[in-house]
């Protein structure tokens, strides 16, 4: 078959021989075994298929390509005179489009990069058969029904078999979706966060079956809101507010000590105990934390005045004897924004701005209305600085990403840069592999692959080091998608348990050159909200430094975050106060929840805290064991073997990630998400491979990027020794 040519078509039409020549070309193809058996060039088209019987099929017919396209120029005519019924076997093999047997079997795609152009110059009408076979999408001839017509299910609902074409656009025209600006406006004007409307998943079923919505809706097709952005955090246990509805714990009843006293006397320490993982593991944890959740905060300007406004502030009042902050009245802490309508006649609930899924929402954002702040066509927006590719930067020279916390620390900003480059690298590769794909298709396929990479690295490289020997017990192997599992982020996970990573922050981070030699570094506090370090030097020196710096065990917090963070604040106090703000039940409740030995008095703590001095200090600060804050008690536990955290944190973290995975219909291991060959490729990915792909210049890398190592030749490998993905697994066949 020929490819359409506008000039050829016009010339042939001008001399009146277009149809004759076109038929002649097709009959020449027939002579090679492609046409109806037993026909000659001058056979009447109506009789050609009709003369074919099952017995006369040639051996070539048995090897005919089974992809869904017509293989003869006269297929449409033969189908019009009933040959699909009277000569069914041959016609369905050679004329499947004309016989309408593709629906539910194949995907409707354009098979040439010029299909769109040819359609605009009316090739769909003047060269209909070739175009309908090879450019059905451009010719608007895809099998299946449009949204406006409805599907083939009861009441016009869509079914999976209706989705024989690939749609890359989620139609949100009939429902109001939220943007970050909507949330900010509601927060400023009404002191609460709005939730979004429940969508009709069936309207965009063909999109949802293949791609994630930006806001996470319709991941679960029966319960479309679970796990979605702009919804309330779920709870594992009922909250304990001082007034039963909304007042922070210990704000009226004074049942617990000052959060500052608990942080200063129990958590703050300059002593460091090293782990066999490295500081890049800590940074990955923060990256993932921002993928899963972002709690909206009320405006804190009023809190700076140290008012006792319980509605907006939960500031930590200070003692004059505090050695660091004694000159201040309080550490200002704004309350988390409540979901509109909660906290009056029901429990106050907090808001998650991000999707609960590991989907790269910190890269791409969590709103379809915000997506173009970060993307341009198939690619993420970039800025070239010092001949290096970065995200766009704001007026303060900080990188702009899908999550506005990207610049909290320069190490986190480095991972945002790394994955922006990785997305764009994948998009460019997919464009080369499938030049007929449009920009939307390339973007969504690239986003899908990046999300799968993050999932894979988190579950195979990150979590086993966090949970140690209890990883299999708490998370285990993937059992498949469970629509009855709620993947939503638990309030107790994001407000307490997963904040353990703050204890891994260190005082100083080195920079290393390509030979892993020290060339400087930065104190932690100097790396906060200052992307200029990587804009000037690139991300490689800092990432090499993170990989060679042993991870700090998280059971204590360095003075960099308890005495000097944010100028005059204490991250330990903020974490404790945040748990109280959210009404999180005390530590002893979570021991029981996790099926661990209960703690009824301070003596019972000896089974999980080996240091008697720590237990004695707990007794002095808290007076009663049932008053111990979840964050404090669980953080102070001795770590599980080979783990970073103790048994209570391992339980809560494992519980969350297990639900995150099992309740995600678009999890990379779900057999419907990637083809078998694509999944084989996804499973090759490692953090080391990503560094090779998207770093500025990593000629050598450690094979295990999250394990601490000495930079010797025996511990480093060349990038070409690290398995890479073969993107030909995503290649779609094109017409010849």
Residue ranges and their predicted role:
Residues 37, 44-45, 49:
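Intrinsically disordered, low-complexity proline-rich tandem-repeat tracts
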């Amino acid at each position: 078959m020929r490819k359409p040519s506008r000039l050829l078509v016009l010339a042939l039409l001008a001399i009146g021989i277009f149809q004759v020549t076109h038929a002649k070309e097709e009959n020449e193809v027939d002579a090679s075994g492609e046409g109806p058996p037993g026909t000659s060039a001058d056979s009447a088209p109506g009789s050609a298929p009709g003369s074919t019987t099952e017995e006369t099929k040639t051996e070539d017919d048995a090897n005919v390509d089974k992809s869904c396209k017509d293989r003869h120029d006269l297929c449409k005519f033969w189908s019009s005179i009933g040959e699909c019924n009277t000569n069914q076997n041959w016609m369905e093999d050679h004329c499947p489009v004309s016989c309408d047997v593709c629906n539910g079997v194949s995907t409707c795609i354009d098979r040439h990069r010029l299909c769109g152009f040819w359609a605009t110059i009316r090739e769909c009408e003047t060269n209909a058969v070739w175009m309908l076979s090879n450019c059905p999408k451009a010719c608007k001839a895809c099998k299946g029904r449009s949204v406006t017509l409805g599907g083939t299910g009861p009441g016009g609902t869509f079914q999976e078999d209706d989705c024989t074409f690939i749609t890359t656009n989620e139609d949100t025209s009939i429902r109001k979706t939220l943007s970050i600006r909507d949330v900010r406006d509601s927060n400023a004007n009404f002191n609460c966060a709005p939730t979004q409307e429940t969508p009709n998943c069936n309207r965009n079923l063909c999109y949802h079956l293949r791609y994630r919505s930006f806001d996470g809706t319709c991941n679960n097709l029966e319960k479309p809101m679970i796990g979605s952005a702009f919804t309330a955090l779920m709870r594992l246990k009922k909250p304990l507010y001082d007034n039963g509805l909304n007042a922070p714990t210990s704000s009226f009843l004074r049942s617990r000590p000052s959060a500052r006293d608990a942080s200063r006397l129990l958590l703050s320490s300059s002593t460091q105990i090293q782990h066999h993982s490295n500081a890049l593991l800590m940074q990955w944890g923060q990256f993932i934390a921002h993928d899963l959740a972002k709690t909206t905060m009320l405006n804190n300007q009023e809190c700076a005045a140290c008012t006792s406004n319980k509605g907006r502030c939960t500031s930590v009042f200070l003692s004059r004897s505090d050695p660091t902050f004694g000159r201040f009245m309080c550490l200002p802490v704004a309350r988390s924004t409540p979901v509109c309508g909660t906290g009056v006649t029901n429990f106050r609930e907090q808001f998650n701005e991000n999707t609960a899924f590991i989907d790269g929402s910190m890269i791409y954002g969590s709103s379809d209305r915000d997506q173009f702040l970060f993307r341009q066509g198939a690619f993420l927006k970039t800025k070239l600085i010092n001949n290096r590719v970065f995200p766009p930067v704001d007026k303060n020279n900080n990188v702009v990403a899908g999550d506005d916390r990207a610049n909290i620390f320069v190490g986190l900003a480095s991972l945002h840069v790394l994955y922006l480059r990785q997305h764009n690298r994948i998009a460019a590769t997919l464009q080369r592999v499938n030049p007929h794909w449009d920009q939307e298709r390339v973007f969504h396929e690239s986003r899908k692959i990046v999300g799968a990479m993050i999932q894979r690295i988190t579950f195979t490289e990150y979590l086993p080091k966090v949970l140690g020997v209890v990883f299999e017990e708490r998370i285990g192997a993937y059992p498949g998608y469970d629509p009855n599992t709620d993947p939503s982020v638990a309030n107790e996970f994001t407000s307490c348990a997963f904040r353990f990573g703050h204890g891994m922050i260190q005082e100083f981070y080195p920079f290393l050159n390509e030979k892993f030699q020290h060339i400087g570094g930065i104190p932690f506090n100097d790396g906060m909200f200052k992307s200029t370090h990587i804009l000037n030097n690139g991300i490689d020196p800092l990432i090499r430094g993170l990989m060679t710096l042993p991870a700090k065990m998280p059971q204590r917090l360095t003075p960099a975050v308890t005495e000097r963070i944010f100028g005059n604040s204490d991250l330990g106090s903020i974490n404790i106060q945040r748990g109280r703000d959210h009404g999180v039940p005390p530590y002893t409740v979570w021991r029981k929840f996790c099926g661990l030995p209960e703690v009824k008095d301070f003596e019972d703590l000896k089974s999980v805290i080996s240091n008697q001095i720590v237990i004695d200090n707990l007794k002095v600060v808290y007076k009663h064991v049932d008053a111990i804050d979840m964050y404090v008690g669980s953080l102070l536990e001795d770590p599980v073997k080979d783990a970073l955290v103790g048994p209570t944190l391992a339980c809560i973290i494992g519980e969350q990630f297990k639900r995150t995975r099992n309740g995600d219909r678009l999890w990379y291991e779900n057999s419907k998400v990637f083809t078998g060959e694509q999944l084989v490729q996804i499973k090759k990915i490692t953090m080391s491979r990503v560094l090779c792909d998207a770093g500025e210049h990593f000629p050598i890398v450690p094979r295990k990027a999250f394990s601490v190592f000495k930079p010797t030749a025996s511990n480093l490998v060349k990038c070409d020794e690290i398995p890479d993905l073969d993107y030909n697994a995503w290649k779609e066949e094109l017409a010849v």
